[in-house]
């Protein structure tokens, strides 16, 4: 059968918080089968847990943030959550000693590396997938996102930026999900922002940790980073990476096709909530044979370059 996965060992790293600009220590811990993905704040007493759940997402202004009823929050979870999706991790405790996950280089790649350092442990319990049974769509003005039935996890994502540095023919991306494809084609895409927005936000004591080290920065005409882009379609690829992380807030791999136009964290979350709220739109499924899985996850001992 296709089994649930956790980590073999505890791993730890430090980075900078995007919004606070302060040092953050991140610890990833193995968890028992059926635990799910738990985000934990250890700098509050007692520590506060946030299960990965679309209902925990209560702020999507500049990132995906988990907020509880007392207003305690963990921000910027989407890139790490995308890495967990990419590596097929079902059960994990994610600890931070700050109100946010460190931004690292603005992509999911450092988190993939961290998970590979920890190693993947398979557990003797079936992995539960969410299979989409009928189309579900959510719209917001000219923006929209939808799920339709498909025997795999396919993504069709389009952005629309009228900017000289963002090529018009590099604003749509189709991706058939696999661990290998995620690591090689998606995980290294960095977040991006406009210098005028960053300057304004920093004047409001936001994105104090934002820099050329963790984002693609543009002015009105060009990319300001000396090294340029990692690949030609890095902008749309990062938006697709964000969507992978946002959709994995349900804690389970999805079998279906995700299509989106100009979608962001809020719309991704609204679609996920709409799907799960409709009992006829989805069903649980497991697989007795690895070969029968419509979603290809890396072998636990395989290191993906």
Curated annotation (Swiss-Prot):
E.C. numbers: 3.5.1.108
Catalytic activity: a UDP-3-O-[(3R)-3-hydroxyacyl]-N-acetyl-alpha-D-glucosamine + H2O = a UDP-3-O-[(3R)-3-hydroxyacyl]-alpha-D-glucosamine + acetate
Top-tier EC class: hydrolase
Gene Ontology BP annotations: lipid A biosynthetic process
Gene Ontology CC: membrane
Presence of keyword Hydrolase: yes
InterPro entries given in the database record: Ribosomal_Su5_D2-typ_SF (IPR020568), UDP-acyl_GlcNac_deAcase (IPR004463), UDP-acyl_GlcNac_deAcase_C (IPR011334), UDP-acyl_N-AcGlcN_deAcase_N (IPR015870)
First and last residue of the signal peptide: none
Pathway assignment: Glycolipid biosynthesis; lipid IV(A) biosynthesis; lipid IV(A) from (3R)-3-hydroxytetradecanoyl-[acyl-carrier-protein] and UDP-N-acetyl-alpha-D-glucosamine: step 2/6
Highest taxon in the source lineage: Bacteria
Cited Gene3D superfamilies: lpxc deacetylase, domain 1, lpxc deacetylase, domain 2
Chain residues that bind Zn(2+): 79, 238, 242
UniProt keywords, alphabetically: Hydrolase, Lipid A biosynthesis, Lipid biosynthesis, Lipid metabolism, Metal-binding, Zinc
GO molecular function per UniProt: metal ion binding; UDP-3-O-acyl-N-acetylglucosamine deacetylase activity
Active site residues according to the UniProt entry: 265 (proton donor)
Cofactor: Zn(2+)
HAMAP family: LpxC (MF_00388)
Family named by the database record: Belongs to the LpxC family.
The protein's role, per its UniProt record: Catalyzes the hydrolysis of UDP-3-O-myristoyl-N-acetylglucosamine to form UDP-3-O-myristoylglucosamine and acetate, the committed step in lipid A biosynthesis.
The name this protein goes by in its record: UDP-3-O-acyl-N-acetylglucosamine deacetylase
Source organism per UniProt: Vibrio campbellii (strain ATCC BAA-1116)
């Amino acid at each position: 059968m296709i089994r649930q996965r956790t980590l073999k060992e505890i791993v730890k790293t430090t980075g900078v918080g995007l919004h606070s600009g302060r040092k953050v220590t991140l610890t990833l811990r193995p968890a028992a089968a059926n635990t799910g993905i738990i985000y934990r704040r250890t700098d509050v007493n007692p520590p506060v847990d946030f299960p990965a759940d679309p209902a925990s997402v209560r702020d999507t202004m500049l990132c995906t943030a988990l907020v509880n009823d007392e207003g305690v929050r963990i921000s910027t979870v989407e890139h790490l959550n995308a890495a967990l999706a990419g590596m097929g991790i079902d059960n994990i405790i994610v600890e931070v000693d700050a109100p946010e996950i460190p931004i690292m280089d603005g992509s999911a790649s450092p988190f993939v590396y961290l998970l590979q350092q920890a190693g993947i442990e398979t557990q003797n319990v079936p992995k539960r997938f969410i299979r989409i049974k009928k189309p579900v769509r959510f719209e917001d003005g000219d923006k929209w996102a939808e799920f339709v039935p498909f025997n795999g996890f396919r993504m069709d994502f389009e952005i629309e930026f009228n900017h000289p540095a963002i090529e018009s023919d590099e604003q749509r991306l189709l991706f058939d999900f696999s661990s290998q494809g995620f690591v090689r084609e998606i995980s290294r895409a960095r977040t991006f922002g406009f210098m005028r927005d960053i300057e304004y936000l920093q004047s409001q004591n936001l994105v104090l940790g934002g820099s050329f080290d963790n984002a693609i920065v543009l002015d009105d005409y060009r990319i300001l980073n000396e090294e340029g882009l990692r690949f030609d379609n890095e902008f749309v690829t990062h938006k697709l990476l964000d969507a992978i992380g946002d959709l994995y807030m349900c804690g389970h791999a999805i079998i279906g096709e995700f299509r989106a136009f100009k979608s962001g964290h809020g719309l991704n979350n609204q679609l996920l909530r709409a799907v799960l709220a409709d009992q006829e739109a989805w069903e649980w499924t497991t697989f007795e044979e690895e070969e029968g899985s419509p979603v290809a996850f890396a072998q636990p001992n395989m290191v993906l370059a």
